[in-house]
Every structure is written in structure tokens, then in C-alpha cells.
């Protein structure tokens, strides 16, 4: 599995918004991370 192709700043912002450790964000499969980001966006729109 390849590491995520995101910047360190993006990973830090995601870790804060998802309340997860940075290491977990960096090792998370991409499809799971995208699903969590979609959930966040739905919550922001509500």
C-alpha cells in the first residue's frame, strides 16, 4: 500500500478535524479517508 499523497499541513488539518492521531491519518487507506472527509463535509453543510 502506498503512503497517502498529501502534504504534512493537510494531514495535520485532517487529524484535527477527525480527532485522530497524525500517524493514523498517514497510514489510513485512501478510500476510508475519503469517506471520512465526505462525512465531515456533510456535517459542515448541515
UniProtKB/Swiss-Prot annotation:
The protein depicted here goes by the name: Uncharacterized protein YycC
Q: What is the lineage of its organism?
A: Bacteria, Bacillati, Bacillota, Bacilli, Bacillales
| Pfam family for this entry, one | YycC
Q: Which organism is it from?
A: Bacillus subtilis (strain 168)
* Record's note on what induces expression: Negatively regulated by TnrA under nitrogen-limited conditions.
